[in-house]
From Swiss-Prot:
Mg(2+) binds at residue 88. It is an enzyme of class 4 (lyase). This is Oxaloacetate decarboxylase. GO terms for molecular function: magnesium ion binding; methylisocitrate lyase activity; oxaloacetate decarboxylase activity. Its EC number is 4.1.1.112. Its cofactor is Mg(2+). Catalyzes the decarboxylation of oxaloacetate into pyruvate. Seems to play a role in maintaining cellular concentrations of bicarbonate and pyruvate. Keywords: Decarboxylase, Lyase, Magnesium, Metal-binding. Homotetramer; dimer of dimers. Substrate binds at residues 50, 159, 235. Binds 1 Mg(2+) ion per subunit. InterPro entries: ICL/PEPM, Oxaloacetate_deCOase_bac, Pyrv/PenolPyrv_kinase-like_dom, Pyrv_kinase-like_dom_sf. GO terms for biological process: oxaloacetate metabolic process; propionate catabolic process, 2-methylcitrate cycle; pyruvate biosynthetic process. It comes from Pseudomonas paraeruginosa (strain DSM 24068 / PA7).
Amino acid sequence: MHRASHHELRAMFRALLDSSRCYHTASVFDPMSARIAADLGFECGILGGSVASLQVLAAPDFALITLSEFVEQATRIGRVARLPVIADADHGYGNALNVMRTVVELERAGIAALTIEDTLLPAQFGRKSTDLICVEEGVGKIRAALEARVDPALTIIARTNAELIDVDAVIQRTLAYQEAGADGICLVGVRDFAHLEAIAEHLHIPLMLVTYGNPQLRDDARLARLGVRIVVNGHAAYFAAIKATYDCLREERGAVASDLTASELSKKYTFPEEYQAWARDYMEVKE
């Protein structure tokens, strides 16, 4: 069986963006899940930053994972992947120069596309954990990412959060990233189709939507007409794996069945309340 090169996988992802359809990602978090996703016919996968933090550190999504740790996991996936994989590269692990290093390392790992978001990460002293960087810095990061890539087929996607700012600010940011040369725009926190339409009508590059299964955004044909090519529903496969592991080990120990959900198990073993308390105590981070 022919195994596509990393460049060929990137070209395959570009073809998805150039199509008129909407595709749903598989959540891939290790080589086995990447192989399963490809075998089941998924057109692309995504290595989420939150999932990588759970898989590598058993830690919540507080920007604790390092670039090296993330790249190591991406490399393991890239070694066996037979489908294009998107890397959720968070904020690029620092400033614009750090973004350049991030692009170099993830390209070498075999990633087909990556997202760079404009959230102020990691959380800063005395600031809200949901604050965004200024548009100018976000533009600088996208320009730096484009400069750093060697394979022109590698897709650079600018990500912003439509839930944290008003629609005019979202339009301002996404237009700026589009003008800076981003290959696509990733939107998180879109409420419904009216919200999406207000943003999408100003853009001419492909859209990626993180919906977390939002029932208000489940019409794939309508999404496709608005320019959405990639949809991320979340990472149910990973959390199902946590639940299955817990239940299996409980059974091996002779324990009675548990009714804890996958989400509850994740919180039970990653201690998010402790991290939140440390952020308040040592950094005066505002909720």
